[in-house]
């Protein structure tokens, strides 16, 4: 069985690795798309909105509801990508804890 000092060293090492992975993830960008890519929403890995792009075809003053729906779809798509990448990137640390 590991002694306490070794466990602490391993925990500190894992913490540094996890912090680096979190920083790497925050630096990444994720772009979510609506149907037909008419609306795109880009976020950083720490879920900060970088931009939203609307194609001309979706901008219709008579149909704001479609624009709203597609914007929501693009945002949710990007956030899902972030969550999946976060789970893949940081989930590996759960099995490495020394206790």
Curated annotation (Swiss-Prot):
Similarity-based family: Belongs to the YbaB/EbfC family.
Keyword set, alphabetical order: Cytoplasm, DNA-binding
Subunit-level organization: Homodimer.
Tagged with keyword Signal: no
A GO molecular function held by the record: DNA binding
Cellular compartment(s): Cytoplasm, Nucleoid
NCBIfam families, per database record: DNA_YbaB_EbfC (TIGR00103)
HAMAP family reported for this sequence: DNA_YbaB_EbfC
Name of the protein described by the UniProt record: Nucleoid-associated protein SPy_1862/M5005_Spy1580
Superkingdom of origin: Bacteria
GO cellular component: bacterial nucleoid; cytosol
Main location: cytoplasm
Coiled-coil residue windows: none
Keyword set includes Disulfide bond: no
Species of the source: Streptococcus pyogenes serotype M1
Pfam families linked to this entry: YbaB_DNA_bd
InterPro entries in UniProt: YbaB-like_sf (IPR036894), YbaB/EbfC (IPR004401)
Function of the molecule: Binds to DNA and alters its conformation. May be involved in regulation of gene expression, nucleoid organization and DNA protection.
